[in-house]
């Protein structure tokens, strides 16, 4: 089993000082930096674009785990790759050809991820699993931080864990939404090996970040 990677979501950071926040979570032990990109069209919120990702890049050497909640998504893949994304994760619903989107991400030399909304079945992975480096399971409906974990997603995580193990490939299984010490434990038990945490990481300000990350890692 891989050690669990913690990917703090900067959606919960102080947007007025994002560079400082990224340096603080890096120092606190974050494995990846999770960047939630929302367009107000695919999801009901607007967050950040490639320019901010690029501005944050000099602040850390940790991998940028960029989750694109935008539609159409293909037009922006190059921009996020150039801005410094390491993993680019896309929704099957965000364009007509998820296979093509994943192919393009790989052609840019980036890790390709696919993300499943709460109602999107694990079966969606049947014909694309061999292309992906990461599967992200949304345990809340995407758009906002601070939501409650949707328990039905544990069954989906377990099903995807079986699919990944059967594939024999090294694919990360990440979970995003409502992650705290309690739900982190459930997600890990179901088979997750990477956790996105916004509220649970950034609660209490910079002095608490290391303890917050440690609590999730030890869940």
Where are these predicted regions, by residue range?
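Catalytic cores of alpha/beta
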Residues: 22, 74-82, 120-132, 177-195
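Conserved, mostly hydrophobic/aromatic
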Residues: 18, 25, 36, 80, ...
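Hydrophobic faces of well-ordered beta-strands that scaffold small-molecule active sites
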Residues: 4-9, 33-35, 56, 64-68, ...
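A structural motif
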Residues: 27-32, 85, 132, 192
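Conserved anion-binding
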Residues: 14-17, 59, 75-79, 85-172
